[in-house]
């Protein structure tokens, strides 16, 4: 076998030397050094100083990222590693992706699956299937259908999917015609994944569905109450120990049960899995001790039932592979390690790894060493804390102690129980044991109808989930009114809940409010209002439960304190999303009243409704939370859901264990989850609320116990990750204990990897992939800089991290592959790949030149001919709309970067006493086209001077101007008005003539029909023009086109850059001024003023040239205005 076997003594060393893995070691690069590299190659496209750093090839944004990037999905190094490791060419049968939440496990699994699918497509018959099993299978399908780069849908189909999604959302109903069209389209795409006749290779199952379909209980089995779990059980559930023979004989027991007619194994599924691929997401769910199920049994069976060479390959995924108990490591390793590779060829049993006495468990001596050995080559570990992509996690509160021991890792918001809560807690005795139906006492207690007044001595509340609904439902109306309690009418999805003023921070004086019943929820409400007053930011509130003190009561608490749900109308007590003031008292003049709103997600809400609420919460339009400020979620949000730009997370109850708490943190701390926010706001503050008593309290005791158990799990995690296959590439080094890991160092470091091995890289097609990667890098570089020499381009391509998202070691690129990439992009004129650069269709051309060949990004004209255009990349081409835009309506639809009304008012102010000609160079094309149409259609008053300027420069035309052209005059002769009435204007390509002001219809004619020559000869000194830079217009100059000779291609690089006049050297500025005849003492004039003189001189000369006889046909060109087309030089070699 070309790849090393797992039992090789130097397995990781051999693996690390292979180029397909070694190249994924991301080289360390200093940020300042990287910026220097960007500027050295003239490819800085954003950030401070980008115009200078990029030499102004294209307009740049000083607030944007400085790095060129590759459009679309790019697999990161960890994803590439596991794709290369677990594929049909390697011998490795099972792999666990132990990656933190939000790092792209699903994409990695899909990338692996794609490799197997490509392999299976070569089978003539009986091709295996790829099974995706897990609670989050729908999310994996969604990723497959929204990422054309993965190869399952086209870009056109993704665009259509987005269009249908938008239309369906606008309909506001899940049953509308638009929604049905969307569902039909999605179903068609999904069938492509699963229908073999359409090229599908996938089967998608939930864990429960998979287990049920694999093991069919017969009628005889039902009569005997047969349970598959009975064949695979723990002999002593209380002690969590296993019978010696339970696991080892499980497959045999299934066969016996099948022979006895109690069960039927689905042979169709088994045959589909033979030699196939099994992907199991959130694998910790299948063997969790606290939630008994047969999910893990089904997976274990399909992995053990086949001979080793026929068993399906497997990819397991989890950020927290062991959750409920450290002894789950036995179940995990039995799934992860093939049976024949376990000690003695038998499944592991718990007594092999653990000593247990009562409820106390500890690792046996040498048990962790066994975990290390068994997991070598079977685990990928990723803990990514790169603050460039992840928001900072901030814990509010402080560390607490329980029984004189400080609880590790976590900070808490300490919430002392109210006196009423403490009195209620006393009812459970001095050392209370909180049963599962009494968990509400951790959060709050409810008013008790046993007492007419809850404030009377010895009164206590309700908290038991069995007793509370009955007691409150039977309470009298008078008692309910007296205590501010309102029973919410039960429904199928919400059998019982209450509301009322007892949940308010400010109840009527005769009613005890929220502070009386819950110290925790009172603190939560105070914190919410404080956050709103501080400024913007979305809030996620988590509670593990739905009923009693869970998310349903949280919903009522918010509503009782002035926070609305998604649909309710504001009332006088509704709070403002900006200042938290109630509407009746809202006196702020600096902002309008916007109601605070929340939404809720839990398992009893229809999935379609949940998806719509989540989409609205995550929408870019809701970045500040002014549409939906708060989302309340139950345990349904713990896995699979992603939340964008959440600034505050409030955790109101501990999930089942600490690993699941980490999952909850991971819902809001995700890669790129905060990229739309300003850098200063890319953080999440976590509020972990805990109810306490003077001696600590039962909830704090629960946290203490779970953290103690978690330390044992962390010891196992460290052993599991010790020899991770990608430790040397991910370079995860942890120096001190942290929530996600104990101290850890990779067993191999980049420094001791060794010499590069190429045999598998060349044999298995990785060279072809390198060519594709280099091609994408080349394209990105041309999008930043349009002209390169061969050596410059190769140096840039081989510079690490120059392209955003490409973090592989470019220094390992082969120059032969670089040459192949160039050939693939520009081998000949007919074979050149078409690219979109700066919204223009281009191709990369090879141009022979001396001393070194050039590669140029040439724009394609309408005939798809390459054009080497001097100004293509810096000219702001904005054609006018093909319909009239009235000024009043333009404000609603303008696509300019500054509203027309703002520019219009500025124009009226600035040009009262200034030369009107200056308007042509102070405003963008979009302003002028809108103004011209307004002058023609709306007949704006008081604009005579502006009209005269437009006419002087032959931009606007009156009836009188058209009369010399009889055939054209017929088009506008019927338009009302005298000879001086404006009827048309010139654009880059045509003259637009009004045919009906009422209908706003236009007729277009070529420019030459009015004797306008777009290719007038340029003067021999200098050419001026204005370039749009954000909201500003910059005056630029360049040499005349005739200076550029077709055989002097190297000059194109200089001309393509353009030149802001002020950046030119003083000597050059003075020379130009002298040639233009500007006679002043130039030595005492600043560069800015000198450039203004040059600009105005060129504009004056342009006007004079146009007004000479036949000036628009033969006049000399001095200045290109907003509606002038820049010249091109077509390269014909």
Curated annotation (Swiss-Prot):
Induction: Expressed in the late phase of the viral replicative cycle. ATP binds at residues 99-106. Keywords: ATP-binding, DNA-binding, Helicase, Hydrolase, Late protein, Nucleotide-binding, Transcription, Transcription regulation, Virion. Residues 524-724 form the Helicase C-terminal domain. One of its GO terms (molecular function) is DNA binding. SUPFAM superfamilies: P-loop containing nucleoside triphosphate hydrolases (SSF52540). It is found in: Virion. InterPro entries: Helicase_C-like (IPR001650), P-loop_NTPase (IPR027417). A motif (DEAH box) lies at residues 281-284. Its EC number is 3.6.4.13. The keyword ATP-binding applies. Belongs to the DEAD box helicase family. DEAH subfamily. Putative initation factor. This is Early transcription factor large subunit homolog. It comes from African swine fever virus (strain Badajoz 1971 Vero-adapted) (Ba71V).
